[in-house]
Amino acid sequence: MMPGGATVTVRLVRSFEHRNFRPVVYHGVNLDQTVREFIVQINEDIPHRAALPLPFKKYSYDTLKIIHQPHGAKTNELVVGLEDDERLILAPGGTLREAGVAHETELAFFCHKDYQTYKANPVSKW
């Protein structure tokens, strides 16, 4: 880990069907904080990001899932992979480090209900 904390890219997923997402980079992330604390931190930060369109700022995000870990293979999915949910969706009570988050990890942040709907019928609308 970097001395000042880790750099983590969070992909805000607004729509799975329309592949509508925006990446946000967080520097100095404490990997020993809980997933729940990081979710609160991101949700508090999103409305203040000038570069984000309004629909991203007002969306209800509640779930983090690992998309890519450093030195690992990337998925072919354009938004987020639909496999390995048990391993890759971060449990709110554990720490980021315990969940497998490291420096330069890429996470997806989305509404769990929308993810389940898309997973049941993974059809893109564009």
UniProtKB/Swiss-Prot annotation:
Family matches, as InterPro entries: UPF0538
Residues annotated as transmembrane: none
Similarity section: Belongs to the UPF0538 family.
PANTHER family linked: UPF0538 FAMILY MEMBER, UPF0538 PROTEIN C2ORF76
Name used for this protein in its record: UPF0538 protein C2orf76 homolog
Superkingdom, taxonomy of origin: Eukaryota
